[in-house]
């Protein structure tokens, strides 16, 4: 008897499946043409940019009817946003984390300003 092969999360996760859809690919490219730049840094969008959902509600994940709920981010900006805000399962104290990063940058300024 063959063992039962379980489907991986990538094969069953509705978010992953939606991001593989033609509808998402078309929407993503349309948003890239409109926004052109990383929302955080202002840098031109890289090939592997992320179209970030501002609404983390899983029930609304595939609702692309309101373009204002999405921003284009390059990968580093996307990682930083999720580091500060959370990952959809957990929410962090982003204001505290952002304050700590600001303090760190100010310290670096002190050590590096001539």
Residue ranges and their predicted role:
Residues 1-26, 30, 42-45, 89-114:
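A boundary/linker detector
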Residues 23-35, 63-67:
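Short, flexible, mixed-charge glycine/proline-rich loop motifs
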Residues 34, 80-81:
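Conserved SAM-binding loop
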Residues 34-37, 70, 101:
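Secretory pathway export signals and precursors
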Residues 40-72, 81, 85, 91-92:
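Histidine-centered nuclease catalytic patch
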